[in-house]
Amino acid sequence: MAARWAAHGPGPGLDEFTVPAEKRRFLEGSRGRIQGLFEVRLAVLEAQGDWRPALPPPGQPPPAARIWVQLAGGGKAVRSAKEYIKGLCEPELEEKEYYPKDMHCIFVGAQNMFLNSLIQDTCADITVLEIGLLSIKGGAEAVVMAQSQVQQFVKLFENNESLSSECESDIKKQFRQFVEAHADKYTMDLLILPSSLKRELLTLMQTECCESRGAIIDLTGSKSPAELLQDKTSKVILTSRDGKMGDEEERNNAGTPVTELTKQMDNVFSDAPETSFVPINVVPPLEAMTSKERQSCKRRFSDAEESLPKKQLSLENDQEVKSVSHNDSSKRDAVIDLISDSSGELDDPSYCIKEGDDISEEIEYKILVNFFRTMGYSQSIVEKVIGVLGQSVEPLTLLEEIEKENLRFQKEQEWSSKTPKTTNLRLGSNANSSHKLEDEDISCKKNPLKTTHTSNETRTERHKARDMPSTQVDAEDKMHVSVCKPVSPDKSSAICYKKTDIYCPGKNHNSTSSDAETDGFVPLSPPQAGAPKDVDFVARGSSDVRCTSAKSKTAVHQKSAGPSPVQNSHSVVEDQLGHCSSYQVRSPNQHTSQMSNFENPTQAHVLSSEIHSANPDREVSGSHRRHIDPSITGVQRFLESLKKPYRLELKNEPGKPYLKHIIIDGSNVAISHGLRKFFSCRGIAIAVDYFWKRGHRNITVFVPQWRTRRDPSITEQDFLTQLEDVGILSLTPSRMVLGARIASHDDRFLLHLADKTGGVIVTNDNFREFVTESLAWREIIQKRLLQYTFAGDIFMVPDDPLGRNGPRLDDFLQSEGCSRDFLSAQKALQSREQYSSETPLFMHVPNPASSSQQPKNRAHGDHSAAWLPLDTNMKACLSIPPQRSASETVWLREALIKIFPDYEQRQKIDKILADHPFMRDLNALSAMVLD
């Protein structure tokens, strides 16, 4: 091969040599990649410069045509590039090398920095054929060197040798800074490589740095040598590895992984007195960095709900052409060919630095949380561990602690499931023990937080404000008795006792209601299907409750209203074991004296044994309680309720005429039933069943199409399939484009259908953003929204949807034609002056024994209706029901007692049932009890 030199040594040089002419097109296509790898300028000379050998001897074929190639740049760079090009065009050896699949991140991660450095060091062409397989070709010496280096990587990876603690810490820190400076979707895979392999990779990156006695961070890799010489002032010459950093620099280098990445980039745009060419993208050790003034880099990520398990991170640069989008990098991840892949990545502006952008610690926090969430860990556990250890800890350390915390949480859940009678609600302690369910993608907050501690504190307060009930209880006070004293005598809380902790939940003085909380009863223990009377509840109401604490060792959880024979033996003990409203606080000495007041000492022993046997599972020592938390959470209660089967049965029977179209906001209903943590399809089925039993047959449920995809936060999706089969479910359009979800606003479908059919929208959303859209929509939002609530699996709607002065529920759900006929019939009846003084007018009630069927009307105030035959055209709308039977009254009384278990309210329940013999509406009767 012919070659001629114009210069020698390390200075600028020029070299010309020949290659086969058929490689011209290949070299032209690889020009950008070669120039970026070796910092040289490549020129393929024109045809007139072609070199041809002398004529061959007779009888031999003529030699192939060759062309001249010219390289300009540093002497060493020119020699390396020449050897690399010769190996590409005329390879002497070609080998395949296998490696473990977990090492794939080395050859494709960190924006191909390690692979490029390996090519620069060995001058062999290395490409990734598939995961676990490399192709190495070039000169014989170059191929052997590359093979040896790859085999060394594999050996270090498989042996997984550890280094000394001090050395290992430095290596991890330097390696983390480097890979985060070239972040991509393989960043986390690189961070968990063995420390010995990390040291070898850093040595590979620093080899050229040592030879050239200086290190230059080059982030472009696309400029020619002439252009690079003009940009001297934009480079930084770093100090030697043995240089020591001052206290100020040590403080500057402390922080989270991303802030350290920022400090590593501080030197990029500062001035330098001199510069020299070295292989591209050489990063020095941390000790060699000189920090001037803080610049910044920005990490951008996608938080779509169905995104890939590994988030892709990148850096942005506004100086480059903005037409190249971030999606291009995700497409190139699927291309394994290094020749076509690397050149594009080197020129991609998404890997450069953007000046003037600040990295928010909130974004760093979200990156860590989202990464561990994709590994299957609960967000609350991840947030808890990061809050304790901080964001600057090694990811592998975080992973180990998260795994330990996850195992501890699973053991607590198993223990809690074995003690279903737990009544102690340790409020606020487990507010973060469940996943958040959000309808929209997570977005980055623009305002950065001051410190990591402030970030965690704010996030904890936000969880508590949403999930925590109104009453605040000190759960760390081990041996105390909280005594509930309601202000009003007619509204007292339920009995709740415990051996070490007794809590009486109620409304706090400063409690405020929010959209995420509904006004309903709070069961203190999971309901038992076979024994409904054993369930204790806290009566709902707005009365203030005062709770005091006293040291005590003895308490009882009473379930039945009647006291035991032993409790009847002494009035003092009866007072002490009675309701919270009559309980008096006593010191331990007073309690001991009361126990000794029994005539027979055996009685005191019997009572003490009964107290201990009443709750054997609550005999937990103080030290043991620190590890096992017996309190129950809303998520656990919801998951327990899913174990009770529910079957949706829509009977094939004609519905009632003159009823409005029911349009259900499926997302709103499902999230409300799932305690705002799950998308509960059972809630949608319960709502549909409620309106079906009322006689409605025109029912439509709108749910976004992406909710039909498999997701752990979506429960019992078979109900959606069942509703879709009968034509009740309608899916609003949504699609995925490049990993991002594009979904239509389902609320618009609700309003459009309500406008066309004159129907009623069942939702708790106020549609505030659509009030100004049109007058028709404003009228729908004002007059045709039906709110609801869930009490467990009971779907409840108000009797007065538009307020106290508005129409009743039955009138609200009737179509316009039937409402006009009803008003005209009432006027005709009133004109005849024939009234009944005792019998109110009711709509027909089918099968009052069903708890989900609702009555049709209710008399209010002093208004009374008439006992008159109805006209022919009114029989379809109205009919007079018979008086409530004794069995129905008993059933309603038992249902109300389940909701209001307090003895004082039972008298009120009996009075209401006696005063309203025609009332079958459980919702209306419950409202009367509360009134």
UniProtKB/Swiss-Prot annotation:
MF annotations from Gene Ontology: mRNA binding; RNA nuclease activity; ubiquitin binding
Top-level EC class as recorded in UniProt: hydrolase
Region (CoCUN): 884-931
EC identifiers of the protein: 3.1.-.-
Domain RNase NYN: 659-811
Localization annotation: Cytoplasm, Cytosol; Nucleus; Nucleus, Nucleolus; Nucleus, PML body
Compositional bias ranges of the Polar residues kind: 416-434, 547-557
GO CC annotations on file: cytosol; nucleolus; nucleus; PML body
Protein name, entry field: NEDD4-binding protein 1
Organism per entry: Gallus gallus (Chicken)
